[in-house]
């Protein structure tokens, strides 16, 4: 017979509170009857929960502090400081007193014990960049505003006006093209870079042409040796007495 596995139960749920207006305290006790809602019954005040309460109910009960316990916060070193009274708290309307600067004395004058603080200065490069940026932004604002107040170019000294003569016309002459045009054909040799730009078919065509040229040169040299006269001479040389068996 198989052993029945024991089912694990979680923590028990707390019981529902009593009727409205009745809260379990140290001076009350929750009792329940079968088939009825829990009833809160008052109990005499005591220093702790009644002994008949369960552990779960003791956690829910509120035990008021006794007047005999004099726990002072000064006994605990890690206790937070006590909150100030409402009158001592600074309000938003009341201005806070400003602390004097480190170089100032109690009366507002210079304190001889503290040396005077140096004025804050930017690095040279950062100051130059900020100045150039500010000038650029100012020019942009003037340009967007319509050019009002834009810096004007320096005025050139006035030159005396020369009277117009018939030899020098007032209007500039236009460009005129000659009716005689010469066309010169320039010969440009195809380089390796140009062949590479044209593609592989151009290189293959050049290789085929070079191969045909070399074959023609070889035929011009070897052709006479393969004719009938050359064959007859070769056979006569080979049939001599020195080569006979």
Curated annotation (Swiss-Prot):
Sequence repeats lie at residues 155-157, 158-160, 161-163, 164-166, 167-169, 170-172. Residues 172-185 are annotated as: Binding to PP1CA. InterPro entries: PPP1R15. It comes from the Viruses. Residues 187-245 are annotated as: Important for interferon resistance. Residues 25-36 have a biased composition (Polar residues). Its main location: host cell. The triplet repeats region may play a role in modulating virus egress. This is Neurovirulence factor ICP34.5. It comes from Human herpesvirus 1 (strain MGH-10) (HHV-1). The lineage of its organism: Viruses, Duplodnaviria, Heunggongvirae, Peploviricota, Herviviricetes.
